[in-house]
UniProtKB/Swiss-Prot annotation:
Keywords: Acyltransferase, Cytoplasm, Transferase. It comes from Escherichia coli O81 (strain ED1a). HAMAP family: Leu_Phe_trans. It comes from the Bacteria. GO terms for cellular component: cytoplasm. It is an enzyme of class 2 (transferase). It catalyses: N-terminal L-lysyl-[protein] + L-leucyl-tRNA(Leu) = N-terminal L-leucyl-L-lysyl-[protein] + tRNA(Leu) + H(+); N-terminal L-arginyl-[protein] + L-leucyl-tRNA(Leu) = N-terminal L-leucyl-L-arginyl-[protein] + tRNA(Leu) + H(+); L-phenylalanyl-tRNA(Phe) + an N-terminal L-alpha-aminoacyl-[protein] = an N-terminal L-phenylalanyl-L-alpha-aminoacyl-[protein] + tRNA(Phe). Disulfide bonds: none annotated. Pfam families: Leu_Phe_trans (PF03588). This is Leucyl/phenylalanyl-tRNA--protein transferase. It is found in: Cytoplasm. Functions in the N-end rule pathway of protein degradation where it conjugates Leu, Phe and, less efficiently, Met from aminoacyl-tRNAs to the N-termini of proteins containing an N-terminal arginine or lysine. GO terms for biological process: protein catabolic process.
Length: 234
């Protein structure tokens, strides 16, 4: 196993099975964040993650963190909160604001550089990256974004500026995703937050098998059309 230097003249990636064990999943460096390369990466179970000032690093960890949307864990207190939720939830209304929110709401710093923002905004314009927004009246207070691969959604980041805002985004999205044929959410690497929401780890080989099947699936043609998903009760 060795770290592969990507060429700017080819969007090809090495097999994820060749990723390093330490650090877990590091596969390649270099290349660029062009739409074609990003889409090729997601189709192969690879994602970019790097610190500002570092070269672009590409990862495919083993095991892989995933969330089966029907297994989303919602605490009793969150269920009570959601019944009286003050939030309105929309899809694809404000992708730029959501990714900016994810970039700025990280006290410990962020990997979401200006180049990353620009790259994913371009994916959004092409219909591949999508956002869920949570509003308190007219103020954006939370949200999440990711990349669609058929009936699999690759979650990238979320943010919250008010109580339970990001959890509300995920809860409402999971419900809508399931109802329209969505199968799986990729969480990349397990952490305490995603584990508390019901995410689990599966072998990379299993994830790649799911990906290869699900990316060929289809959600309804109008699933990603900008729309309101949830409104507070009057």
């Amino acid at each position: 196993m060795r770290l592969v230097q990507l060429s700017r003249h080819s969007i090809a990636f090495p097999s994820p099975e060749g990723a390093l064990r330490e650090p877990n999943g590091l596969l390649a460096l270099g290349g660029d964040l062009s739409p074609a390369r990003l889409l090729m990466a997601y189709q192969r179970g690879i994602f970019p993650w790097f610190s500002p000032g570092d070269p672009i690093l590409w990862w495919s960890p083993d095991p892989r963190a995933v969330l089966w949307p029907e297994s989303l864990h919602i605490s009793r207190s969150m269920k009570r909160f959601h019944k009286r939720s003050p939030y309105r939830v929309t899809m694809n209304y404000a992708f730029g604001q959501v990714i900016e929110g994810c970039a700025s709401d990280r006290e410990e710093g962020t990997w979401i550089t200006r180049g990353v923002v620009k790259a994913y905004h371009r994916l959004h314009e092409l219909g591949h990256a999508h956002s869920i927004e949570v509003w308190r009246e007219d103020e954006l207070v939370g949200g999440m974004y990711g990349v669609a691969q058929g009936t699999l959604f690759c979650g990238e980041s979320m943010f919250s500026r008010m109580e339970n805002a990001s959890k509300t985004a995920l809860l409402v999205f999971c419900d809508e995703f399931i109802r329209h044929g969505g199968k799986l959410i990729d969480c990349q690497v397990l952490n305490d937050h995603t584990a508390s929401l019901g995410a689990c780890e599966i072998p990379r080989r299993d994830y790649l098998n799911y990906l290869n099947q699900m990316r060929l699936g289809r959600l309804p043609n109008n699933f990603w059309v900008p729309r309101c998903l949830f409104s507070p009760q009057e």
